[in-house]
């Protein structure tokens, strides 16, 4: 078991050295992807450390996820420090192949796309799989519709952080989120 944990840690360290920004538990069953960073996050602050992260943690707890079931992933690149030439540009969307590598390494049961920028990165990374979904709106990752991609439930919220300032929008994203209870939940 220690060998598996060490291998996972090494893989995650490698991803972070190539510009991937993550926060939380890499073994979480749910990954929250944010592409439209706020000013604090753009300046190097911790991802999802503000009101949006607090609201997401509270929502996940209310839905039955454990407190440690929180993993945030930026859909835009942070600084790369592996010393090799890279196609990763800090502040730009993660390249499709790198985003896909990260998501496959994390291997969550569910993926929540918090904004349009994260939807665009997901669409690029999983274009072939999304094209195989019969319903057009689901394949386009329309907010509120759950898409099944390689056995994962994928849900776009359509601007989570902005929704926090409006009561009606908050209710809408809460209704969307309730479609992703933990696997095996009794409800």
Tell me the role of every PLM-derived stretch:
Residues 1-187:
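A polyanion-binding, active-site-adjacent surface
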């Amino acid at each position: 078991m220690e060998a598996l944990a060490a291998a996972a840690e090494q893989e995650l360290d490698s991803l972070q050295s190539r510009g991937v920004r993550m926060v939380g538990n890499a073994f979480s069953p749910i990954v929250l992807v944010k592409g439209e960073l706020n000013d604090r996050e753009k300046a190097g602050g911790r991802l999802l450390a503000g009101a949006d992260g607090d609201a997401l943690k509270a929502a996940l707890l209310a839905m039955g996820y454990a407190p440690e079931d929180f993993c945030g992933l930026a859909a835009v690149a942070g600084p790369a420090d592996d010393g090799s030439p890279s196609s990763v540009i800090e502040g730009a969307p993660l390249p499709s192949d790198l985003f896909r590598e990260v998501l496959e390494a994390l291997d969550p049961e569910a993926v929540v796309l918090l904004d349009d920028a994260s939807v665009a990165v997901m669409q690029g990374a999983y274009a072939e799989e999304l094209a195989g979904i019969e319903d057009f709106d689901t394949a386009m990752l329309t907010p509120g519709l759950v898409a099944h991609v390689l056995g994962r439930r994928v849900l776009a919220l359509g601007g989570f952080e902005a929704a926090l300032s409006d009561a009606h929008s908050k209710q809408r994203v809460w209704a969307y989120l309730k479609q992703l209870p933990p696997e095996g939940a009794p409800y």
